[in-house]
Amino acid sequence: MSFESNEYFDGNVKSIAFQSATLPGTLGVMDIGEYTFDTNAYEFMTVVNGALTVKLPGATDWKTFNAGETFEVEANVSFDVKVKVQTAYLCLYK
Amino acid sequence: MSFESNEYFDGNVKSIAFQSATLPGTLGVMDIGEYTFDTNAYEFMTVVNGALTVKLPGATDWKTFNAGETFEVEANVSFDVKVKVQTAYLCLYK
């Protein structure tokens, strides 16, 4: 068996797909930078190490999520992320 | 930039290397199975999602670590791991 990995934004974001005990997920790392992500499913994004500063859909302000914190994003929307230190995250899809 | 990823045990363990705010680290996924890891540095292993049942160096019993729990391993030793569900982990090296 081999886990599938994916790269985005010219390799600045890299993730490995896996099947958790409950939901499909990806485990990934983001380099320093700013990104806009599009969702295909409802997402539970947890910061594992580092921090993500996020502008959620419909929001006007940015909110920073640190290690251990989770934010949720609806399916079929976009959200913006600013990364100031290489950050590890876990995303579970519902 | 592109993050370096590595595979072990015929792809049953896959990780991405990154530089956290404090220490170098890897973020990885283990498939169901049993593995013996050799350490080159002092390791802080944190279970991100799933569980790892571990026999630490010199130990006779196995201990299960769940999501959010961390175990530490000296450099230049081996430790055994049993994985019963695909498990995501973070390893920081000192």
Swiss-Prot record, chains A, B:
This is Pyrimidine/purine nucleoside phosphorylase. CDD domains: cupin_PpnP-like. Keywords: Glycosyltransferase, Transferase. Its EC number is 2.4.2.1, 2.4.2.2. GO terms for cellular component: cytosol. Pfam families: Ppnp (PF06865). GO terms for molecular function: guanosine phosphorylase activity; purine-nucleoside phosphorylase activity; thymidine phosphorylase activity; uridine phosphorylase activity. The keyword Mitochondrion does not apply. Catalyzes the phosphorolysis of diverse nucleosides, yielding D-ribose 1-phosphate and the respective free bases. Can use uridine, adenosine, guanosine, cytidine, thymidine, inosine and xanthosine as substrates. Also catalyzes the reverse reactions. Gene3D superfamilies: Jelly Rolls. It catalyses: a purine D-ribonucleoside + phosphate = a purine nucleobase + alpha-D-ribose 1-phosphate; adenosine + phosphate = alpha-D-ribose 1-phosphate + adenine; cytidine + phosphate = cytosine + alpha-D-ribose 1-phosphate; guanosine + phosphate = alpha-D-ribose 1-phosphate + guanine. It comes from the Bacteria. Belongs to the nucleoside phosphorylase PpnP family. The keyword Plastid does not apply.
